[in-house]
């Protein structure tokens, strides 16, 4: 599962996702990409599940770039614990994704395979996405 090696702080605020993406909003590496169309928090397991779906459909051809990384700890209190007594322990890691952000890029496969692979990957994510090409 994806998570940072070291962090400055153990816990983070919940925060809100405002505006659209300015960084990582254009294709930099591959020819085809999956672009986020809504603001959402994506967890590490979902990113990994989407990556596995991508690589399996591509049958290890081409190359995949993951443009997001879960760097925010999400804490959770144990089951059946009363309110109060501080914030819970970090449970998993998440990434705040703004609309317009590139999630995955792929290269070295045909457009039909790329479209199908990215469609399968998008099914693993809790967000509305869009297939885009570098040279449209």
Swiss-Prot record:
List the PROSITE patterns: RIBOSOMAL_L16_2
Checking Gene3D superfamilies in the record gives: Ribosomal protein L10e/L16 (3.90.1170.10)
UniProt keyword list: Ribonucleoprotein, Ribosomal protein, RNA-binding, rRNA-binding, tRNA-binding
A molecular function (GO) term? structural constituent of ribosome
Cite the InterPro entries for this sequence: Ribosomal_uL16, Ribosomal_uL16_bact-type, Ribosomal_uL16_CS, Ribosomal_uL16_dom, Ribosomal_uL16_sf
Q: Which domain of life is it from?
A: Bacteria
The Gene Ontology biological process terms listed for this entry are:
translation
Identify the CDD domains for this entry. Answer: Ribosomal_L16_L10e
One GO cellular component term of this record is: cytosolic large ribosomal subunit
Pfam families in the cross-refs? Ribosomal_L16
The family database entries (PANTHER family) matched by this protein are listed as: 50S/60S RIBOSOMAL PROTEIN L16, LARGE RIBOSOMAL SUBUNIT PROTEIN UL16M
User: What function is annotated for this protein?
Assistant: Binds 23S rRNA and is also seen to make contacts with the A and possibly P site tRNAs.
The Swiss-Prot or TrEMBL record describes its family as follows: Belongs to the universal ribosomal protein uL16 family.
Its quaternary organisation is: Part of the 50S ribosomal subunit.
Mind telling me what this protein is named? Large ribosomal subunit protein uL16
Instruction: Give the source lineage, highest ranks first.
Output: Bacteria, Pseudomonadati, Pseudomonadota, Alphaproteobacteria, Candidatus Pelagibacterales
This chain is encoded by the gene named rplP
């Amino acid at each position: 599962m994806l998570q940072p090696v070291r962090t400055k702080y153990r816990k983070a605020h919940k925060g809100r996702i405002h505006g659209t993406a300015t960084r990582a909003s254009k294709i930099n590496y591959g020819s085809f990409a999956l672009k986020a169309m809504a603001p959402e928090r994506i967890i590490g397991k979902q990113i990994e599940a989407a990556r596995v779906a991508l690589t399996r459909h591509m049958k290890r051809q081409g190359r995949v770039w993951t443009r997001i990384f879960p760097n925010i700890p999400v804490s959770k209190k144990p089951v059946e614990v009363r309110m109060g007594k501080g914030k819970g322990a970090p449970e998993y890691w998440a990434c705040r994704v703004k609309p317009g952000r590139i999630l995955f890029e792929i290269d070295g496969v045909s457009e039909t395979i790329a479209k199908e692979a990215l469609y399968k990957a998008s099914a693993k994510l809790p967000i509305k996405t869009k297939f885009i090409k570098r040279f449209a």
